[in-house]
Amino acid sequence: MLSRREMGALCASLLFCLLLSLGAGWAQSQLTTADQLAADTLRLHIRADTDSVRDQSAKLAVRDAVLALTDEACPADSRADARAWAAENLVRFELTARQTLASLGIRTPVKACLVNMYFPTRRYDGGALPAGRYDAVRLNIGTRRAGRNWWCVLYPGLCRSACGGYDTPAENDLVCGEYIVRFRFVEWWDGLTAPREDVVLAG
């Protein structure tokens, strides 16, 4: 028969194993949701030429023009539709950006491409997206591309807010919930495992 001390040690061991099992299950569910989130999201990445007031203002003007284009023409039924439309309209993105810059008296190269790239955690109105690799439409303005970047969500939400726009409750919960341990865990794991190299998919 087990002594009281041995019984206490056994109960503590069983409790530890139970908590470890629950923690592993929770961690796996967060990683699975984060992976699904990345698969259901199309992002926008605009790189300015420099940090000068002129170039940063130009970047924001291009942003507004691109958002107007996507609001008007981009299908929003699914991420797959949005991605296919973006890949087919990269020249249109470039033309829109060049016309916007020309209206400001700026003549500089613009390159649009579809990439898979690593994003840090970003906060948006009503929610946030965890760090990880996402597909994105990227616009490079100029040749130096040394200025501050601008990120947002093209689908879902068209850069307004991603909150509530996903198919599953778990995805919406991860995006729209409070920035707590679950985000920290996803960030920590992606920091260890996610490659940082950009992969050009089109353009």
Task: List each model region and its residues.
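Mid-length scaffold segments of soluble, non-membrane domains
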Residues: 80-147
